[in-house]
C-alpha cells in the first residue's frame, strides 16, 4: 500500500507535538501492514465520504488523536490528523 498525504494532512501533521508525530508514524506503519491492526481501531465513519464518493475511515494514533483517510485501490489517501475533534471535519 502507498500513501497520499493531502496538503491539509501535511499541515495538521506539522503542528503536532513531537511525541504524537512519532506515534503517528508508527500508526501509519501499522496501517500499511494491516488495516485491522488492533491498536488502530480503524473504522468507517458513518455517513462520511470524500469529494469522490469514497468512504472516510478514522484510525487511532493515541487516546486523544486520530487520523482520517480513504482507500482507493492500493492507496490510502490521508486527509486529517489531530485531536479527536477532527471527526467533525474529516476531509
Spans of model-derived segments:
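Enriched for short, Lys/Arg-rich terminal
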Residues: 2, 10-18, 22, 51-54, ...
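A short, surface-exposed loop/turn module that caps and links secondary-structure elements
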Residues: 30-60
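N-terminal first-folded block
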Residues: 5-41
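Short, mixed-charge, low-aromatic patches
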Residues: 1-3, 45
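Flexible domain-boundary/linker segments
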Residues: 26, 41, 45-48, 76, ...
Amino acid at each position: 500500500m502507498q500513501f497520499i498525504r493531502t496538503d491539509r494532512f501535511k499541515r495538521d501533521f506539522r503542528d503536532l507535538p513531537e511525541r504524537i508525530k512519532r506515534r503517528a508514524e508508527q500508526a501509519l506503519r501499522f496501517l500499511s501492514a494491516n488495516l485491522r491492526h488492533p491498536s488502530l481501531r480503524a473504522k468507517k465513519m458513518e455517513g462520511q465520504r470524500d469529494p469522490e464518493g469514497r468512504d472516510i475511515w478514522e484510525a487511532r494514533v493515541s487516546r486523544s488523536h486520530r487520523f482520517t483517510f480513504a482507500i482507493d485501490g492500493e492507496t490510502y489517501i490521508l486527509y486529517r490528523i489531530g485531536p479527536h475533534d477532527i471527526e467533525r471535519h474529516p476531509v
